[in-house]
């Protein structure tokens, strides 16, 4: 019918495209009747792609154009993607067919000047700092991170453990078994997976942090015994700490199935506080006169709030 418009080869532009569509793509070029919402689904094989990895983060760009019946381009969208495989074989996690070691760190969103409000450049500087210290993996403790952060992990080359915003320290023995919370658990994990599953950097999912020891976790432990062991948190960097890293890594480098972990954590969460004499210090619990606080428990990173590395980082 005249009201239908078929997608044309002329409207599909790709930097590496030779102008020939596979049959599966041609068959999927659906006719969409304006203004009814429509969807085009197709799958195809792309030859000679370079696999994405933290060491070689090759990305490709998908270019989409939405065209009205008159042939006018009304919307353009670009999406960077990477190609990689992640499988568990025996007791090893394989990326592109090879076992990997996670030199990881736990990272919270934090800036000593702006608190939890970060710019894209703040995120980039965090990742560049981690690159300088030879980290290759980040756990998004304890919530899904901004998509901009995942985009940067795709670009710069980091393996990411995406963690759902499920945290129930004080009640985890009850909430994880309470059916009233089932919908919330499933929804939070599902929304994270649906949003982030196309980022090549995301290779693992975490269902939450310290959120239960119920029967569900007994079942999960039984399932995990024949899987790789990757520590989501270890070597807590508070005070005079991180002194046994050599022993950890001797074991990691010598035992199959032990594939690294994520140090707690990247940096101290001490915001700048200006004192009466004009000097500035990194503050923590109690420094603002509050009576209920957790003391210096927010200062358990390998770098100070001003990004100066502690001896723990050198260790």
Model-derived regions: residue spans:
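Aromatic- and acidic-residue-enriched segments that line the glycan-binding/catalytic groove
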Residues: 150-161, 173-186, 273-285
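Substrate-binding clefts and catalytic carboxylate motifs of secreted carbohydrate-active enzymes
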Residues: 201-205, 215, 225-315
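Secreted/periplasmic carbohydrate-active enzymes, especially glycoside hydrolases
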Residues: 1-160, 188, 198, 203-204, ...
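Short beta-alpha connecting loops at secondary-structure transitions
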Residues: 169-179, 187, 207, 232-234, ...
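Active-site beta-loop-alpha junctions enriched in small/polar residues
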Residues: 107, 143, 165-167, 208-210, ...
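Active-site neighborhood of glycoside hydrolase catalytic domains
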Residues: 155, 176-226
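Aromatic- and acidic-residue-enriched carbohydrate-binding clefts of CAZyme catalytic domains
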Residues: 21-25, 103-108, 116, 161-185, ...
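Acidic-and-aromatic substrate-binding clefts and catalytic sites of carbohydrate-active enzymes
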Residues: 138-147, 211-215, 237-241
């Amino acid at each position: 019918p005249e009201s239908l418009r078929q997608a044309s080869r002329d409207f599909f532009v790709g930097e590496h495209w030779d102008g020939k569509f596979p049959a599966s793509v041609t068959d999927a070029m659906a006719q969409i009747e304006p203004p009814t919402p429509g969807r085009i689904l197709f799958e195809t094989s792309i030859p000679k792609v370079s696999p994405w990895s933290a060491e070689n983060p090759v990305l490709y760009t998908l270019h989409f154009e939405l065209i009205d019946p008159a042939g006018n381009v009304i919307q353009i969208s670009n999406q960077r993607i990477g190609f990689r495989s992640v499988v568990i074989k025996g007791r090893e996690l394989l990326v592109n067919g090879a076992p990997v070691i996670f030199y990881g760190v736990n990272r919270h969103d934090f800036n000593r000047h702006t608190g939890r409000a970060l710019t894209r450049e703040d995120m980039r500087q965090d990742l560049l700092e981690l690159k300088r210290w030879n980290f290759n993996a980040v756990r998004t403790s304890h919530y899904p991170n901004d998509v901009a952060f995942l985009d940067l992990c795709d670009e710069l080359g980091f393996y990411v453990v995406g963690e759902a915003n499920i945290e129930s320290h004080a009640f985890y023995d009850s909430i994880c078994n309470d059916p009233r919370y089932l919908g919330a658990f499933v929804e939070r994990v599902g929304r994270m997976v649906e949003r982030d599953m196309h980022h090549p950097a995301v290779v693992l999912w975490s269902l939450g942090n310290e959120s239960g020891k119920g029967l569900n976790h007994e079942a999960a432990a039984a399932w995990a015994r024949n899987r790789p062991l990757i520590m989501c948190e270890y070597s807590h960097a508070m005070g005079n700490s991180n002194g046994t890293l050599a022993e950890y890594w001797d074991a990691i480098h010598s035992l199959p199935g032990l594939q690294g972990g994520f140090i707690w954590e990247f940096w101290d969460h001490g915001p700048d506080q200006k004192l009466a004499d004009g000097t500035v210090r990194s503050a923590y619990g109690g420094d603002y006169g509050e009576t209920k606080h957790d003391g210096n428990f927010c200062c358990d990173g390998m770098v100070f709030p001003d990004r100066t590395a502690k001896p723990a980082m050198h260790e």
